[in-house]
Amino acid sequence: IKFGESTAVLAGNSLLTMAFEILASPSLQISEKTKVNLIKKLSECSGHLGIAGGQYLDLSYEKKKISKSKIIEMEIKKTGKLFSFCCAAPAIIKKKNVKEIKFFENIGSDIGLLFQIADDLIDFKGSSKIAGKKTGKDQKKGKATLISLLGYMNAIQYCDKIILKTNKNLKRYGSNSKNIKETLNYILHR
């Protein structure tokens, strides 16, 4: 752990603002309308409906008994919304219909939820070397996680359900979805 949590937060904030800078750049070869749609979607995913809102819930749920649905909502906002944007952006650029864009947003939300739960699993039982940060912090702070609610093994089983659901949804893309399927397994088993 080289720089600490506060530096990591600042780096994350800087990277997020760089994303807006890139999307607004005149050198980005997409229509102005598409740029506006991407910036709007990224704003939704990073503001109170996304990352910032999820982080707020994370802090406000500490040391409280929180339902499974509220934990999932928090984790989707906290992490899933960013993955949602990443999966929806190509569909927005390709001018897909609203249904297709929503499909990819949902895939991204599930991938982000899986990533967040896997991150919580590493924090619970993993090493600082793998995590790249101190582990065991969630339990000490009384964080509301699926692990604290369901237990370690049940959280893993929930992740397996997310992977099965996502793979089923991606089936229509055949071998084109191979990399995503491999990534899902990597996320859980890293």
What does each model-identified segment do?
Residues I1-L170, K178-L188:
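Mg2+-dependent prenyl diphosphate-binding active-site environment of isoprenoid biosynthetic enzymes
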